[in-house]
């Protein structure tokens, strides 16, 4: 899902509630502070390399049964590029968290620690990412009227149903 939809919050909850699990937030792999981020192809490739390295490490570690990963994956090519870099077989569930544009705007503009210019820039990018997420072949979860706890429960039910 797009930035501001609740991916990190939900993933933290999932990791806390599921035994022998670990989480990776893709933003950790190219965090650029509070300044305007560089979204060039060079930095995207660096982020994908870093993410793949960490995911492969987690998947190979027998201490973890479940790896929760969150990142803005709004293009099928990003997902394919990342999956092609993973070396160990695993069960894969891809959820896209979405919400209405009004709810997304409210969430972004209520975020602490961002300047108004940063919020405007995030809102612009988030709108583009939201439409891309809706087009992917994933399990879409509309979080507009849900709490993070509700979304966490829905994901756990879908994962454990298999």
Please give the residue ranges for each predicted region.
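ATP-binding Walker
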Residues: 5
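Conserved phosphate-donor/acceptor-positioning beta-strand/loop module used by diverse small-molecule
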Residues: 71, 88-108
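Short glycine-/polar-rich loops that comprise or flank the Walker A/P-loop
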Residues: 64, 88-93, 134-138
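Conserved substrate/cofactor phosphate-moiety recognition/catalytic segment
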Residues: 8-53
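Conserved nucleotide-binding/hydrolysis micro-motifs of P-loop NTPases
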Residues: 29-30, 74-75, 98-103, 146-147
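Glycine-rich phosphate-binding loop used to anchor ATP phosphates in small-molecule kinases
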Residues: 46-89
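P-loop (Walker A) phosphate-binding loop of NTP-binding proteins
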Residues: 2
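Small-molecule kinase domains that catalyze NTP-dependent phosphoryl transfer to phosphate-bearing small molecules
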Residues: 113-154, 162
């Amino acid at each position: 899902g797009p930035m501001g939809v609740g991916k990190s919050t939900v993933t933290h909850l999932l990791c806390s509630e599921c035994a022998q699990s670990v989480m990776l937030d893709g933003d950790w792999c190219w965090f650029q502070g509070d300044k305007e981020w560089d979204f060039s192809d060079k930095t995207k490739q660096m982020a994908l390399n870093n993410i793949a390295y960490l995911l492969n490490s987690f998947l190979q570690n027998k201490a973890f049964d479940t790896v929760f990963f969150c990142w803005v994956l709004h293009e099928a090519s990003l997902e394919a590029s990342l999956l092609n870099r993973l070396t160990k077989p695993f069960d894969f569930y891809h959820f896209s968290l979405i919400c209405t544009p009004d709810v997304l705007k409210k969430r972004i503009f209520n975020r602490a620690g961002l300047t108004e210019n940063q919020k405007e820039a995030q809102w612009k990018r988030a709108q583009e990412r939201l439409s891309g997420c809706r087009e992917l072949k994933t399990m879409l979860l509309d979080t507009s009227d849900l709490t993070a706890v509700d979304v966490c429960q829905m994901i756990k039910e879908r994962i454990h149903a298999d």
